[in-house]
Amino acid sequence: MHPSLLSPTSLGPSGSLHSPISTLSSPMNGLGSPFSVISSPMGPHSMASPGVGYGPSISPQLNSHMNSVSSSEDIKPPLGLNGVMKVPAQPSGTPLSLTKHICAICGDRSSGKHYGVYSCEGCKGFFKRTVRKDLTYTCRDNKDCVIDKRQRNRCQYCRYQKCLAMGMKREAVQEERQRAKERSENEVESTSSANEDMPVEKILEAELAVEPKTETYIETNVPMPSNSPNDPVTNICQAADKQLFTLVEWAKRIPHFSELPLDDQVILLRAGWNELLIASFSHRSIAVKDGILLATGLHVHRNSAHSAGVGAIFDRVLTELVSKMRDMQMDKTELGCLRAIVLFNPDSKGLSNPGEVEALREKVYASLEAYCKHKYPEQPGRFAKLLLRLPALRSIGLKCLEHLFFFKLIGDTPIDTFLMEMLEAPHQMT
């Protein structure tokens, strides 16, 4: 297939949408499919297995969060440490790490070794502030004030002198500050590198470019007979059919997608179209109460869905996707990254180079994690929370496919050209 098939769709003289493939004399152009890449000849195994999960591909960045709990502080005391008083010896067999210490400065309970000495959080913080701000103190008495748990705040001069006498090191505070600075610089460099490979700005642009311009919303919350031309199942199918037209345009705007072999682009779109559309209308429905907002501007209420016999899957969309997206206030950049992760599915059958697709997915993971750290620094678990929506999206996508195949089988629901093409694709290729 010629690369020109990936040119943008256009409006004809009548205002109707024309496929980019309509200008070619291919025998497969009769349907006028919006999937310019879909008409590429493929082998019998180009359809992705619907049962493939996200498990093995979960980002190593997520794993790093789960493995970073080891302490940098050594709480095992060296024998004979000056100024440290031990509680009575523990019974034999008690791990040394469980032995409790008291603060060498004031006698309060120690929280570990800080700047070379076992000390409490209060004395640790006092010493750090003194060094970092280069503070100087004076003693009102004879520079021999008692420093204990009750009186440690009475004389800052004597408290600081005792910190030094017990072995606290000024240079340890300065080294800690330098390490923090270097760590921050490394994180900025890592964030910049990840974003250069897979810029989230481009992913956001892709989302905004295909966003439906719906000015008015039509609400359907009155139950209608299932054979009505306006029943919710028909409305959803018609909206999905229209959105399939924009899906290729969206994918072409995702960084590096158009660089993949044409047949691989076809495979990835066929494998993920249902999840990609579900993610979109779920996020679009965040502001809607007890319903979903379709790209056509139609608001489908859950009462209508229950009347049409699709209440169970409809409620799953509301509780597992729409509600979760609303609660965490998922933004469009995060939505775009999740959809890009779905698109770059290395487990799709028939890919010529799954490793290349997996590398692109990893780049999206890295960019999304960096974006979350930068945009939401007060929510360290946000990246993981976003990824946890993917299994629910996969499960709901499979169930929706089952419903669509059933509607196609019984023939009660009109299914338009493009959606029918996607449902019949596996049979056409075998």
Swiss-Prot record:
Protein's UniProt keywords contain Nucleus: yes
Region (AF-2): 415-426
CC per GO annotation: RNA polymerase II transcription regulator complex
Region listing for Disordered, in residue ranges: 1-25, 48-73, 174-196
Chain segments carrying region Required for nuclear export: 316-336
NR LBD domain ranges (all copies): 195-426
Keyword Electron transport part of the UniProt annotation: no
UniProt: 9-cis-retinoate binding residues: 284, 295
Chain spans, region Modulating: 1-99
Chain residue ranges for the region called Hinge: 176-192
Compartment list: Nucleus
Protein name: Retinoic acid receptor RXR-alpha-A
